[in-house]
């Protein structure tokens, strides 16, 4: 299975680099602290609804797109890191 792609990587590769945007410039334009954008770009912070709305407005992309990327990433990462352990430990409830 391929490694899940963090939305921050998509932000950098598909939006920031083509437009020549730095972390500081994007943070200023979004009216957020630069460390928020830095953490997203570095894959250590999730995209929240607030950030999704800001990114969506700025790049003319729906906020749901940004949230969808995060919602796709989170379970894939969890499955990769702890999936077999979770499946092994959780008791399945029988169907009624």
Model feature map: region roles:
Residues 1-21, 68:
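A short, Lys/Arg-rich alpha-helix, primarily the initiator
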Residues 18, 29, 58:
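Residues within the alpha-helical elements of helix-turn-helix
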Residues 21-39:
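Short alpha-helical DNA-recognition segment
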Residues 31, 42, 71:
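Residue-level detection of the helix-turn-helix DNA-binding "recognition helix"
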Residues 44-57:
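Short, basic-rich loop-to-helix N-cap that marks the start of a DNA-contacting helix
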Residues 57, 65-96:
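Short, charged recognition helix plus adjacent turn
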């Amino acid at each position: 299975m391929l490694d899940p792609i963090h939305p921050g990587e998509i932000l950098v590769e598909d939006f920031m680099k083509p437009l020549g945007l730095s972390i500081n410039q994007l943070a200023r334009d979004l009216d957020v602290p630069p460390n928020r954008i830095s953490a997203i770009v570095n894959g250590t912070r999730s995209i929240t609804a607030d950030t999704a709305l800001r990114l969506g407005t700025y790049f003319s992309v729906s906020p749901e797109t940004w949230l969808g990327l995060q919602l796709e990433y989170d379970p894939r990462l969890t499955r990769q890191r702890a999936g077999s352990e979770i499946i092994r430990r959780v008791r399945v409830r029988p169907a009624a």
